[in-house]
Amino acid sequence: MLGFLNLHKPTGMTSHDCVGKVRRICGLKRVGHGGTLDPLATGVLPIALGPATRLLHYLPDQKTYQATIQFGLTTTTDDLAGDILSEQSANHLAQEVVEKALPQFLGSIEQRPPAYSAIQVKGQRLYDLARQGKDVTAPLRQVEVFDIQILDWQGGEKSELQVEIACGPGTYIRSIARDLGEVLGTGATLAQLTRTLSCGFALADSLTFETLAEQVQAGTFSPLEPSFSLQQPILHLPPAEAQRFCWGQKLPQDCADGMMQVHDTSDRFLGMGEIIDGLLKPKVVLPAQ
């Protein structure tokens, strides 16, 4: 089995848990995911099956989330899973004030990941250090936020803002919620998170575990072809050159430099190659299917 699964991750499971469950359902050992989702989050979790795990690095890295941010509350994890650090009324907040604060979170920004996160400091993950009671400050990281759109606003003691955020890899929506609360002086935490787009996969096309299991049992499950989500240009090779590519040999090509999807003339996906100075160098060669 080779290809991708657009999994609809349920709440309450880690991304690692999801990989394990897919292994059991599909009867595969080689399974990987294309970007961690917090246990409380739901939505798109790209899954690579078999040798397609070698292609995860080449998938598009933009992500889109729908998030609900609750004001007047801060927690140890920057979401509702953590212990409460502070509470106050946020009924004085107006949507217009919140809206004016959002542009500072756009573009290339410095962001501090949550204390409970998978970021490593001196070889240890922050969530392990936090559970040990160690007070470690996460290092600042540069991330990209392309767009923030307000979807809904509910005023009150714990005012809530629903937004859609398009961002690059490594962006923590929990950190945006926390930092927005600090800017507005009320504190805030992430109340709900759904990833609607990741690695080129959309939520509307995702499969639940239940649907996946039904399809596997019925023999109707078919992984998505690599080219479904890869966005690099396609280079078609004639039979002799395709064979040489599969042997790992460099090939002269009169094309612009860059990463390419490599296909044969029957449009069978062979792998990924990079053209540098007129030479195609195989980067990933997949086994014949």
Swiss-Prot record:
Protein's GO biological process: mRNA pseudouridine synthesis; tRNA pseudouridine synthesis
Reactions this protein catalyses: uridine(55) in tRNA = pseudouridine(55) in tRNA
Signal peptide coordinates: none
Residues of the active site: D38
UniProt keyword list: Isomerase, tRNA processing
InterPro entries: PsdUridine_synth_cat_dom_sf, PsdUridine_synth_N, PUA-like_sf, tRNA_psdUridine_synth_TruB, tRNA_sdUridine_synth_fam1_C, TruB_C
Top-level taxonomic group: Bacteria
GO MF terms held by the record: RNA binding; tRNA pseudouridine(55) synthase activity
Annotated EC: 5.4.99.25
Family to which this protein belongs: Belongs to the pseudouridine synthase TruB family. Type 1 subfamily.
Record function comment: Responsible for synthesis of pseudouridine from uracil-55 in the psi GC loop of transfer RNAs.
Protein name: tRNA pseudouridine synthase B
Organism listed in the record: Acaryochloris marina (strain MBIC 11017)
Lineage of producing organism: Bacteria, Bacillati, Cyanobacteriota, Cyanophyceae, Acaryochloridales
Gene name linked to the record: truB
